[in-house]
Amino acid sequence: MGGISHVGSKKSCYAIAYARNNTPKEKIFGIDIESQKHYIFFQKKDEFYDVFLNKNEQEEIEKLLKDQAYLYLIIFSAKESIIKAFYLKYKQIIDFKNIKFKALDGAFLYFYLRQESLIEITLEVKVYFFHTNNEIITISCIEN
């Protein structure tokens, strides 16, 4: 079991991956990598935000007084990593809007996730993020 993510441009391409044996009681991880340059997509507030954030999340993020375009990019990447981990665990696709941003604490983001399918799945997910010179990397973990 494992995961992969990549980001590229005309000049360079980067990938991040992991692989491990799967046992039923182990944690499930999801990873994502984004170019820090992609923050420009988040500088202009438009309908793009509505694709991955509900209105309440947008209001909560605006209260944080951080570099908001950069924070939006980190949250987008974190949700991508959660979607990947969720699929590995449950073999289901989850919508961005079913993953709700809760809090930012240092290098960690916290989310509340709810998926209604054959069974209702409700989780709290912790996502670690860090950056290199040019990329943002997020790693989510779903506990078994």
Explain the meaning of each model-derived region.
Residues 1-144:
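Conserved nucleotide-ligand handling architecture
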